[in-house]
Amino acid sequence: MPKMKTKSGAKKRFKPTASGFKHKHAFKSHILTKMTTKRKRQLRGTSLMHPSDVAKVERMLRVR
């Protein structure tokens, strides 16, 4: 039987680390004038995925 392919969209969006999966924040691409500076600053950078979503992403990436 052939190997299972990973979901290419998930492969581009999530990066596995020792403590979970890193991901970028949403809502930070365009039409940012109405957003406050504080909100834009909070959306900067990456964060770890919520534990309830980890199982779904592991299944998409065929990890563990």
From Swiss-Prot:
It holds the Pfam family Ribosomal_L35p. GO terms for molecular function: structural constituent of ribosome. Residues 1-27 are annotated as: Disordered. Belongs to the bacterial ribosomal protein bL35 family. It comes from the Bacteria. GO terms for biological process: translation. Keywords: Ribonucleoprotein, Ribosomal protein. GO terms for cellular component: cytosolic large ribosomal subunit. It comes from Azotobacter vinelandii (strain DJ / ATCC BAA-1303). This is Large ribosomal subunit protein bL35. The keyword Nucleotide-binding does not apply.
